[in-house]
Swiss-Prot record:
Part of a heterotetrameric complex that catalyzes the two-step biosynthesis of anthranilate, an intermediate in the biosynthesis of L-tryptophan. In the first step, the glutamine-binding beta subunit (TrpG) of anthranilate synthase (AS) provides the glutamine amidotransferase activity which generates ammonia as a substrate that, along with chorismate, is used in the second step, catalyzed by the large alpha subunit of AS (TrpE) to produce anthranilate. In the absence of TrpG, TrpE can synthesize anthranilate directly from chorismate and high concentrations of ammonia. This is Anthranilate synthase component 1. It catalyses: chorismate + L-glutamine = anthranilate + pyruvate + L-glutamate + H(+). Binds 1 Mg(2+) ion per subunit. It comes from Streptomyces coelicolor (strain ATCC BAA-471 / A3(2) / M145). GO terms for biological process: L-tryptophan biosynthetic process. The gene is trpE. SUPFAM superfamilies: ADC synthase.
Amino acid sequence: MTTHAAEAPTTDPQGAPGSQKTPDATEAEEAARATVPHRAAAAALAREHDVVPLHQEFLDDSVSPVTAFAQLCGPDEAGFLLESVPVSGGVARYSYVGHRPVPLEPTGGDPLTALRSHLARSVAPVPGLPPFHGGVVGYLGYEAARHFEDLPLAAGPPPGLPESAFLAADDLVVFDHATRRVLLMTLYRPARESYDDAVARIVRLNRALRRAPAPAAFSGRPLAAATPADHGTQGWTANLTEAQFTERVARAREHIAAGDAFQIVLSRRLSRPLRARPTDLYRHLRATNPSPYMYHLSLGGGRHVIGASPELLVKAEGRTVRTRPLAGTRPRHPDPAEDLRLERELRADEKERAEHVMLVDLGRNDLGRVTEPGTVRVERLMRVERFSHVMHLSSTVRGRLAEGRDALDALRSAFPAGTLSGAPKIRAMEIIAELEPEQRGVYGGALGFVGADGLTDFAIALRTMVVADGHVHVQAGAGIVADSDPAAEFRETLHKSRAMLTAVRRAEAAA
């Protein structure tokens, strides 16, 4: 990707092509008075920093993150919605909606090298801001690992999205669910614009939220309960049939028996024509499978990445970096007693425990390459986390970045996740390229953001739907080890796909 983003096309508040109305003098002055930091304070900060975050409070409790995204991002425009939905009580504090982000053009080279150029040297500290207040949002596809290691690619190309894609986002709507505030934010860059120019962007964002009609699809109708037919695979085309997948599992076990790897994560893709709007897919996925990482990334031109990932790949705040592997799976059961029995079964399963410990060790090694010696610690080990359709064993690994290393170095070291590739990672990926018929694309990669100040938070791209060329694609995998049962591993791919299949069926039924 290039290090300079082109100017975004102008739009009117409805999202149609046209010129943007400039605030008149009175409106501009009122907006400046409502903006924090105020003009004089921002000028003082601008003398010391490259970027000054500005914000206004938006007073309209009828706007939600989902409706704001639908209002601000037309069906063929670039935009994003990032949320965290709690799965077991509590409040997930922030949701972010990007307004008119600028796509970064791909260069064909190392995507992380290009991303580093978008980090500001210094971002002004402004009290009371959310953690992410602008930067770059996007994904690294699984095959982007070829820029970091000498790796082969599977023969077939993935569905029609670029290998990696990022959007430069200076203008945001931020929902603070703890304080029930909505903030309109922009990054003021004093070297290339005036304070009034930055405030004018907030004014246009305010207008767009107030004047755009709410989409009919978000009428508040209750969502019907899912049925077994919702997550069936009838009408879907698989890139590996059950027989083909189980045959690949047998071949993976042969590699493991030969000492080539300890674990190999094999996946299969399901595809079908899409007869619903991508925004409705996200709405239904959010309802059926709330997850710590929820995202709808629109690349424009009818291309979307919509997901509900449970798993952190890398998060870096200051010098502290974390990864959180999930490995070991059981389906959820509606009967609490049976659900508890499945949890006990998961905790006692020696195969699942051994697989999980192996992947925790892989995470420790990944962080160890970029952290100070002796700082890598396992904060918690093998807790059970429940999601709507499955439960997983979860652990958290933490370290302190070494001098001269940054968050993007940690992302490079951990990418792709061992939980989506195997161990040892490089050899497992070589075997995956041999056994899977197509490149994975987004699946198994990572999606998240790099803040202008360096804050980095990337989830593993799983439980993720790709929309391209009028089709929707879902993909799920299973970790193959020496004693894997091929039929059980196939069933695991179905369990992991259920939430996405349900979201598609329900969105189409409501269309």
